[in-house]
């Protein structure tokens, strides 16, 4: 007897069959391959080209040396080093311009060292709160490269001169850093990219068609001051589009952070290595991202249309001493520079009129009106961009067509009597006899598995939030590994248990149907948000649903390969009767275990098929045809199909396990088509969004924001990422799930017990020192999250023996703790004398009240500083700065009044003259924002503080308290600024 005859269920190995080994191997390979590509895109920066391969006019070696020089020290606006950087930039610009002037064919270049513009404005108010007023003096450097199609006249030299022709292109970067960071990525790389753009577009052969303005702005870190005061320069009326280069991380790839519209975003496709998603822009719209960039000024105030490109990770180095050249690399610099070159070249070469038509707002430049767009990169090599309205139309169409196609297909299946889905049994004519089809098996399996596999990761998110909430700060991928591994193992375990007890050939069809329903609902929600709120972050749901629809349709089309239900039932009934007659003639009736494999316990046939009745004396001599997907013929009620023993073995070998016997004609390869239709696009789009979201938010805990939203995102995106496995996972062998179970156990233990911070992923603690010049006392304050803030303070020698006064911080879970610290030495008698002046001499101020009116003039000046401010216990109604410009586009006051006036000067030890007037409102004693008791004054009096700021942290010993904190704080702590100044000194005042 041959082996096949000995074991009728032996089947030849088919490498693409829907059986455990091919399913496990192929699915694992597909997921790993695409996931690795997605991870490589996020973790590996494209290498910088060699000098020989660099674009003509670009010198990366020079750019890197410029970055090293720029980041030699801290250079905030209120520092001497900032003046040095300003002078160095002018020198570098002039050198590049001289080189281009010596070459033939170079464009005209004009350099504006803007030391005239100034502006008074405000933050516009928040709800009913008083606003903050600002006076700022410009030290911006503006470089204009005249385009070949620009107005040849120097129109900016005329009184009220305006440019003719098409608008130019603005590329912006700020050259100031924070007082605690060297500014390599925030925004040194942007600055040196501007220098290289200047070299590139002044090189022969690269002359721009439209004018290009390079803005080296100063003062972004303190209040976007540099961009706001740029609005007072003539060039702000010339530019219609912009590219803003920023940094909110410390390397990696430069990400397209946000964009004003579809039309301008299309120019980003010129970038050699595009990277970004519309998700980040919607984060700003929804208020999830609180920090801002110069983008809001260029677009919101001036009306320019453009792009915001920024480094986004790791945020633990952002605004710290690790934002330096040592912690980044030339590859990241090249990525930003290549993006800037590609995008800018496209903008300055554009000949259309999209950015030159009139706008409805007369206060803004005539840059036209754009359309909301959707954009995302694919593996950092390709870039997709299209209108949000287009996606809305496609989504609505698909929401209607998808269910309609499946409904029509279901009707066709019912008409041809092959709709096994939702079919429990089939009646034989009008008789009471029925044959079981077991078509409901697996109907509710997928929603149960989907629910459990979603709930468990969410439960783990709660667990991490309670036990070790900040582990994601340093171990994002450990959290991802935990979530993904538990999802796959639980899904496999539940699917295998269900398949063991109730095997079903319809598992795939039912799984896809449920996923179709869930993604249909997701697309409805996404479409509503896109239409009503302009939110495009759910763009991936369209592609997700489209792929699910196609995969589901394949499962429905597969059913056409099955025998007609009536035909199957008649054949099963006949065979049952013949076998029952044969069995009744035996002396001994066999037990259920002795029955043939195709006879169920109730006598019904388990493997009914048109071709499987045993030959008898009455059997026709002609064997009937097999019923297959490709070769099916209908017959009358008396038509009978017969098979040889060999055919019977083939049929039985085509049935997997104990699944329904009618399933033997189902195609065995279509699962691969479904996998390839759905899995890659889901991994690419969902994986991209998930990684971008968690990468940008993994370190928000140090800012006082709850990390639960990060863990919740990991949990939900795990479900979205691996839901395409549900139709196949019951076929997996135990090897991969068991391995993932071990991964889950290991990562769970690690995530629960590991210390969340490290020298490579430090916790940010925010520093400020406040000096009361009236009594000479000072307090050092650190702001951070507990219990790590207390651990840091306990390591500081000057805090030993003192009880720190801790209060609720400015946001979320932040706590602020203060103690009496080492006195600062920010003011000296003269540059050559180390003797520190008494604190009472640091600020000079004079207040003169207008007789009979609630008006006063305040003159204030600080030693060794160019930044001061006035804080009022009750808001003033209005204020004016002597010699300042005002702009109705940037109101300087509001109905709520002004609680604080910030004063910035380009001149050291400047004297500001501020006129204020206030309403006659009674003042009740209470607690001020900083905890100091308010003074009880009459309704015609005004009280407050005169404060000056010191931010220069380049010389050791000037701020001993900061030096001490940096020296003794744990290695896993990074010190960042808490406010505009590192040291703030104040006098109280009362105007009577």
From Swiss-Prot:
EC assignment: 3.4.-.-
Residues annotated to bind Zn(2+) 1: 174, 186, 246
Species for this entry: Paracoccidioides brasiliensis (strain Pb03)
Keyword Transmembrane helix: yes
Pfam family for this entry, one: Peptidase_M28
Source domain of life: Eukaryota
Glycosylation: residue positions: 59, 115, 118, 237, 805, 846, 954
Record's keyword annotation contains Nucleus: no
Record keywords, A-Z: Glycoprotein, Hydrolase, Membrane, Metal-binding, Metalloprotease, Protease, Transmembrane, Transmembrane helix, Vacuole, Zinc
InterPro entries associated with the record: Fxna-like_M28_dom, M28_fam, Peptidase_M28, PFF1_C, PFF1_TM
GO BP terms: proteolysis
Membrane topology designation: Multi-pass membrane protein
Membrane-spanning ranges: 25-45, 391-411, 447-467, 475-495, 509-529, 534-554, 672-692, 709-729, 737-757
Location of region: Disordered: 579-620
Catalytic residues in the record: 220 (proton acceptor)
PANTHER family recorded: METALLOPEPTIDASE M28 FAMILY MEMBER, VACUOLAR MEMBRANE PROTEASE
Function noted in UniProt: May be involved in vacuolar sorting and osmoregulation.
Location of this chain's protein in the cell: Vacuole membrane
Residue ranges that the UniProt entry lists as topological domain Cytoplasmic: 1-24, 412-446, 496-508, 555-671, 730-736
UniProt-annotated site: Transition state stabilizer, residues: 318
Cofactor(s) named in the record: Zn(2+)
One cellular component (GO) term of this entry: vacuolar membrane
Name of the protein in question: Vacuolar membrane protease
Co-factor: note: Binds 2 Zn(2+) ions per subunit.
């Amino acid at each position: 007897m041959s082996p096949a005859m000995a074991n009728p269920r032996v089947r030849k190995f088919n490498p693409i069959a829907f059986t455990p080994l091919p399913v496990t191997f192929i699915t694992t390979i597909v997921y790993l391959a695409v996931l690795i590509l997605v991870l490589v895109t996020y973790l590996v920066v494209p290498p910088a080209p060699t000098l020989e391969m660099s674009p003509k006019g670009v010198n990366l070696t020079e750019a890197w040396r410029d970055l090293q020089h720029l980041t030699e020290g801290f250079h905030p606006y209120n520092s001497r080093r900032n003046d040095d950087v300003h002078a160095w930039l002018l020198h570098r610009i002039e050198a590049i311009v001289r080189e281009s002037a010596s070459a033939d064919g170079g464009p005209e270049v004009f350099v504006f060292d803007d030391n005239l513009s100034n502006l008074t404005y405000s933050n516009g108010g928040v709800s009913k709160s008083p606003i903050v007023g600002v006076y700022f003096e410009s030290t911006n450097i503006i470089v204009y490269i005249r385009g070949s199609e620009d107005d040849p006249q120097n129109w900016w030299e005329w009184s009220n001169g305006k440019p003719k022709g098409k608008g130019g292109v603005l590329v912006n970067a700020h050259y100031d850093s924070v007082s605690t960071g060297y500014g390599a990525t925030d925004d040194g790389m942007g600055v040196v990219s501007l220098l290289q753009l200047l070299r590139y577009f002044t090189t022969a052969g690269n002359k721009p068609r439209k004018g290009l303005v390079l803005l080296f702005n100063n003062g972004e870190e303190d209040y976007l001051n540099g961009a706001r005061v740029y609005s007072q320069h003539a060039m702000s009326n010339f530019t219609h589009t912009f590219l803003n280069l920023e940094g909110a991380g410390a390397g990696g790839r430069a990400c397209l952070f946000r964009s004003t519209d579809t039309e301008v975003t299309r120019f980003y496709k010129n970038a050699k290595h595009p990277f970004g998603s519309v998700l980040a822009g919607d984060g700003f719209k929804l208020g999830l991202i609180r920090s801002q960039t110069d983008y809001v000024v260029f677009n919101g105030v001036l009306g320019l249309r453009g792009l915001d490109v920024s480094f986004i990770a790791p945020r633990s180095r952002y605004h710290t001493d690790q934002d330096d050249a040592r912690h980044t690399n030339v590859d990241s610099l090249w990525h930003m520079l290549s993006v800037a070159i590609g995008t800018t070249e496209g903008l300055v070469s554009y000949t259309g009129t999209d950015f030159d038509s009139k706008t409805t707002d007369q206060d803004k430049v005539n840059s036209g009106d754009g359309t909301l767009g959707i954009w995302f990169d694919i593996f950092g090599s390709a870039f997709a961009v299209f209108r949000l309205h287009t996606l809305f139309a496609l989504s609505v169409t698909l929401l209607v067509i998808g269910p309609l196609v499946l409904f029509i297909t279901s009707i066709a299946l019912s008409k041809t009597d092959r709709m096994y889905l939702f079919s429990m049994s089939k009646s034989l004519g009008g008789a009471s006899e029925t044959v079981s089809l077991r078509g409901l098996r697996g109907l509710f399996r997928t929603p149960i598995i989907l629910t459990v596999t979603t709930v468990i990761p969410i439960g783990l998110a709660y667990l991490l939030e309670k036990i070790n909430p900040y582990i994601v700060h340093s171990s994002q991928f450990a959290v991802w590994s935990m979530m993904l591994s538990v999802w796959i193992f639980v899904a496999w375990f539940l699917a295998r248990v269900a398949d063991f007890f109730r095997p079903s050939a319809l598992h795939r069809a039912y799984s896809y149907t449920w996923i179709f329903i869930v993604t249909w609902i997701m697309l409805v929600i996404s479409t509503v948000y896109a239409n009503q709120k302009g939110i495009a972050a759910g763009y991936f749901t369209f592609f997700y649903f489209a792929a699910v629809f196609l995969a589901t349709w394949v499962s429905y089309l597969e059913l056409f390969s099955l025998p007609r239900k009536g035909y199957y039932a008649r054949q099963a009934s006949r065979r049952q009767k013949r076998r029952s007659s044969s069995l009744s003639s035996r002396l001994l009736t066999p037990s259920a275990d002795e029955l043939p494999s195709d006879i169920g316990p109730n006598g019904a046939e388990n493997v009914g098929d048109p071709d499987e009745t045993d030959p008898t004396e009455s059997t026709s001599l002609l064997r009937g045809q097999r019923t297959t997907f490709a070769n099916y013929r209908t017959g009358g009620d008396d038509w009978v199909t017969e098979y040889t023993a060999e055919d019977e073995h083939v049929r039985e070998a085509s049935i997997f396990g104990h699944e329904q016997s009618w399933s033997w004609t189902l195609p065995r390869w279509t699962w691969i088509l479904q996998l390839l239709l759905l899995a890659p696009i889901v991994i690419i789009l969902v994986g991209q969004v998930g990684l971008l979201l968690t990468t940008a938010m993994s370190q928000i805990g140090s800012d006082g924001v709850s990390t639960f939203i990060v863990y919740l995102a990991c949990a939900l995106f795990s479900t979205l990422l691996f839901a395409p496995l549900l139709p196949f996972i019951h076929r997996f062998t135990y090897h991969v799930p068991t391995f993932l179970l071990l991964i889950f156990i290991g990562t769970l233990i690690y995530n629960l017990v590991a210390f969340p911070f490290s020298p490579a992923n430090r916790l940010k603690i925010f520093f400020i020192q406040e000096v009361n010049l009236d009594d000479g006392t000072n307090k050092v304050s650190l702001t951070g999250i507990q219990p790590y803030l207390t651990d840091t303070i306990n390591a500081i020698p000057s805090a030993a023996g003192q009880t720190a006064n801790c209060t609720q911080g400015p946001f979320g879970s932040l706590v602020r703790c203060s103690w009496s610290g080492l006195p600062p030495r920010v003011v000296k008698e003269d540059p050559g004398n180390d003797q520190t002046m008494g604190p009472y001499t640091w600020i000079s101020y004079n207040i003169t009240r207008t007789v009979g009116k609630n008006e006063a003039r305040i003159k204030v000046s600080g030693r060794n500083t160019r930044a001061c401010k006035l804080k009022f216990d009750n808001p003033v109604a209005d204020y004016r700065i002597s010699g300042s410009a005002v702009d109705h586009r940037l109101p300087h006051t509001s109905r709520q009044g002004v609680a604080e006036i910030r004063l910035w000067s380009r001149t050291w030890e400047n004297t500001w003259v501020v006129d204020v007037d206030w309403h006659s409102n009674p003042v009740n004693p209470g607690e001020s924002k900083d905890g100091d008791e308010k003074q009880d004054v009459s309704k015609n009096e005004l009280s407050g503080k005169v404060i000056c700021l010191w931010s220069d942290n380049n010389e050791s010993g000037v701020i001993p308290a900061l030096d001490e904190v940096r020296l003794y704080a744990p290695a896993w702590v990074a010190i960042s600024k808490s406010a505009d100044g590192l040291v703030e000194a104040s006098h109280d005042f009362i105007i009577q």
